[in-house]
Amino acid sequence: MTLFDEEIARLDVERADLAARAARETNDGRRAYVDAIVARVERARATLAAAAAADSGVEKPTTTGGDGARVHARDLTPRRFRLEYVATDTPVVIEGLGSALTEDGADGETCAWLTRRAGNKKVAVTRKDGHRRATLSCEVTDVLDLKDFFAEVVDDRGAGSYLYDTSIPLKLPSLSESVRVPAYVAHDYMQRTMRLTAFSRSWPSLFVAAKNTRSSLHVDQWQGHFFMAMVRGTKRWTVFSRESLAFLRPSWSRGTLDPAMPPLEEQEEMGMLPLPREFGARRWDVDLGPGEVLFVPGGSPHAVRNLDCTVAFAGNFVDDVNLDRVLEDLKLMAAKDPALMESYRALDEVDFDDEGAALAAGDDDVHAGAFDANARVVRVADYLAGGRFV
C-alpha cells in the first residue's frame, strides 16, 4: 500500500464518520456546516486519487526558490505587491522596513517600546510548546506581566513558552502607539466595513516566543491572507500552496472547516507525501529576520519554528483576491454560530469596487532617490479606520 493509498483509506473512514454526524444533526445550519466539511474531505480524497493514478514519479517536496521571493520595500509599492504577489498567491518576504516598524525606529529590535508601553500588562502565556499541535486548546498557560515574560525568553529561561496571537487593539491597546502596520495590507476589507465585525479589532496581534518553540502546521480560519512583521529574532517558516493541502495528511475529524495536520517535523520523519507540481502543490522555506515582513496567501498551510527569542506582530486580511472564499467560509461558520452572521453581512454588503486600483501596474512612487521606509507603513489607528488603503 502506497502513502497515497493509506491517506485515501483514512479519508474514506473520516468521510463516513462525518456524513453520519451530519445525518444525525437536527439543526439545519449545523448540518449544512458539517456537509461542507464532508465536501472538503471528498475534494482532498479526489485529489489524492488523481495523484495516485497519475503516478508520475513526482519529486520529493523540497522546493524552495525564487519561489520564496524576496524584494526590498524601496522597489515594491503596495500596488505592485497586490499585482505580483497577492493576485498570484505567491509568498514574499519584504525587506528594508526595520527602521519603520516601531516607534523606536532603528532601535526597535531592542524592544524597549514593548516593555515601556505594556510591560506591566498581564498576558496569558502558553507553556510546554502548546502550539506545536493543531489542537483546539492549549493545556498549560500562565498569566504574568509582559515585562517578566519578555525577560524570561530573552534570558533563555522560558523554554517552550509562547505569547501567541494576542490582539493589540483589544488586549494591549497601549502598544497601538508603538507598532506600525505595513502599508501593503492597509487596504484590508475587514477594516472598511460600515459596521464592526467580530474580527475588526483582532489585529495587529503580538507574538513573543522562546527559542525553539513552534506553531503547528495549520491553515488560518476563513481563508484569510496573513502578514507578519518581524521585530526581533528569526522565525523559520514553511509555507505550502493552497493546492498542497490534500498532500499534508489533513484531518477534519474535529469538525472545523480548517483541518488539523500532524506536526511538520513528524511528517518529515515518517515520510511526507510527494507534492506533485501538476496539481499545483508547492513548498517554500524561508527564514524571516528583523525588519522583514512576510506575506502568506489565504488558504496556504504553514508552520513556524522560532530559531531564537522572537518578537513579531501580525494579522489576517481580506481583499478582492480572497473575498469570495472568505465570504463562503464566514457564511458556513455563521450557520453553525449565528453570532457570526452579522460579521458575514457586514463584509458582504459593501461593494469595495477597487479591483482596478489593486491590479494597476503604475508603480509611480518608486523613486531613484533616498528611500524612506516610513512611507511603507501606517499607524494602527489609520489601519483600523480603513482610511489609508491603496
Where do the model's predicted regions map?
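N-terminal accessory scaffold of Fe(II)-dependent oxygenases
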Residues: 2-293, 301-390
